[in-house]
Amino acid sequence: MAITKKILLPFVLTILFVISSVHCSDDTQGFGIKQEYKQCYTPDPCRKGGNDECERFCVAKSGLLYGKCINDGSKDVCCCLTK
């Protein structure tokens, strides 16, 4: 059975697509951003508007974060956490 150009080209393109898909996947165990992020900042947003202002402050830093006022013992500080 002869392999014609009509069959060979789609076959090669399919193989290249499959190989590139495998290399681009990030399902490898132990890699990626799976941990929780928590970064606390000044208490200013919490003083200005509580959790709502802290939320706006964190979303402005990154759309992947949410804000929460957390008491650190003496005052509320604005902490940005992962969603």
UniProtKB/Swiss-Prot annotation:
Signal peptide per UniProt: 1-24
GO CC field: extracellular region
Location relative to the cell: Secreted
Record carries keyword Secreted: yes
Gene Ontology biological process terms, A to Z: defense response to fungus; killing of cells of another organism
Cystine connections: C40-C80, C46-C69, C54-C78, C58-C79
Top-level taxon in the UniProt lineage: Eukaryota
Entry keywords, A to Z: Antimicrobial, Disulfide bond, Fungicide, Plant defense, Secreted, Signal
The UniProt record lists the keyword Secreted: yes
Family: Belongs to the DEFL family.
Name listed for the protein in its UniProt record: Putative defensin-like protein 111
Gene field: LCR50
